[in-house]
């Protein structure tokens, strides 16, 4: 099967595969070391097949108390690619595999390629998921209407996403560092009137390369040097929102 986003429509796609495999073999552990320096726990968008092929990643992530979100079976298959009648079964399968591998049922979800059908939020809520990240429409959590259960958006960031910055827009590592710091500066200023979510999407095969990783380290050092920065996970943000704002989204606690 061709690798989504690699630029090749052929299989086997050796360059596309080896770069991504490098991320699983080397890059992810390099990211672990950097995050650990700053006492940051990752919120991992976990393809279920990673649980089956790379158990060492799960083991090391659990040691660091990382959060695991559902992220489909594989990034090569969007939720939009499945027949409509199969989507719920796929969500259930992903939840079962992730729960079995990590020891905890995932509470969050981001679709491969941010893909959703009109039924996805309802299916997720029915299966016990409580937040979704596909909707990067705000800088704060947003409640969603679902048929059963409950659901909110904890926004995923596209602007300083390392794939967009490096692969699609061809920025340098130095420019990435400056972009992340500028992004943070604006959110930090705006947080005076209400908290903001700074989601920093990292892909091990992108930011985990040797000549890029130190710029992530520099950016995190800058961010964490500021007072009042909450180094937290997606679920902890969602849980806070549910406990304080879900029933009255317009309320502000000064």
Report residues per predicted region.
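Binuclear metal-dependent hydrolase catalytic cores centered on His/Asp/Glu-rich metal-binding motifs
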Residues: 158, 164-179
């Amino acid at each position: 099967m061709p690798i989504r986003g690699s630029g090749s429509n052929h299989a086997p796609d050796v360059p596309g595969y080896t770069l991504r495999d490098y991320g699983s073999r080397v890059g992810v552990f390099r990211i672990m070391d950097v995050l650990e320096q700053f006492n940051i726990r990752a919120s991992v968008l976990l393809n279920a097949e990673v649980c089956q092929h790379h158990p060492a990643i799960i083991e090391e992530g659990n040691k660091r108390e990382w959060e695991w979100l559902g992220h489909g079976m594989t990034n090569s298959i969007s939720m939009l690619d499945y027949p409509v009648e199969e989507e719920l079964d796929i969500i259930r399968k992903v939840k079962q595999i992730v729960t079995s591998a990590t020891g905890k049922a995932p509470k969050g979800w981001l679709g491969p390629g941010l893909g959703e059908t009109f039924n996805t939020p309802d299916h997720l809520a029915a299966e016990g998921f409580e937040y979704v990240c596909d909707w990067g429409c705000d800088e704060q959590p947003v409640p969603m209407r679902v048929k059963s259960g409950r659901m909110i958006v904890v926004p995923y960031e596209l602007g300083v996403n390392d794939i967009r910055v490096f692969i699609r827009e061809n920025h340098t590592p130095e420019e990435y560092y400056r972009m992340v710091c500028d992004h943070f500066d604006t959110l930090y200023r705006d947080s005076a009137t209400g908290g903001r979510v700074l989601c920093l999407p990292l892909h091990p095969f992108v930011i985990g390369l040797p000549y890029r990783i130190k710029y992530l380290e520099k950016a995190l050092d800058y961010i964490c040097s500021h007072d009042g920065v909450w180094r937290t996970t997606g679920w902890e943000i969602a849980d806070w929102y549910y406990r304080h704002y879900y029933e009255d989204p317009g309320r502000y606690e000064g």
